[in-house]
Amino acid sequence: QWLSFLGEAYEGAKDMWRAYSDMREANFKGADKYFHARGNYDAAQRGPGGVWAAEVISNGREALQGITDPLFKGMTRDQVREDTKADQFANEWGRSGKDPNHFRPPGLPDKY
């Protein structure tokens, strides 16, 4: 059972990385919430280990962005807080098994 959990976590982490890589490649305005939801959704489909990996990675990413966004994007604390809230909503949406296409922006290439 523990080995299964670790395998799910590993595969879930790969799902999260794939969504992040696709987001960077697409470079499509307004698509970040879709990729957040999709990565979490795909990881969660792996099982409890995937859910765990998605949550740890999502929370870590948001904590890091709380530091880097004000420095590199010039965002205020309020802007960071709102963006984090929206990102976490999309993360939880996907992790709970809801369709990530809810956040898909019009015009995003079908490849994603």
Swiss-Prot record:
GO terms for biological process: acute-phase response. Keywords: Acute phase, Amyloid, HDL, Pyrrolidone carboxylic acid, Secreted. The lineage of its organism: Eukaryota, Metazoa, Chordata, Craniata, Vertebrata. This is Serum amyloid A protein. It is linked to Reactive, secondary amyloidosis is characterized by the extracellular accumulation in various tissues of the SAA protein. These deposits are highly insoluble and resistant to proteolysis; they disrupt tissue structure and compromise function. The keyword Secreted applies. InterPro entries: Serum_amyloid_A (IPR000096), Synovial_Prolif_Regulator (IPR052464). Its main location: secreted. It comes from Ovis aries (Sheep). GO terms for cellular component: high-density lipoprotein particle.
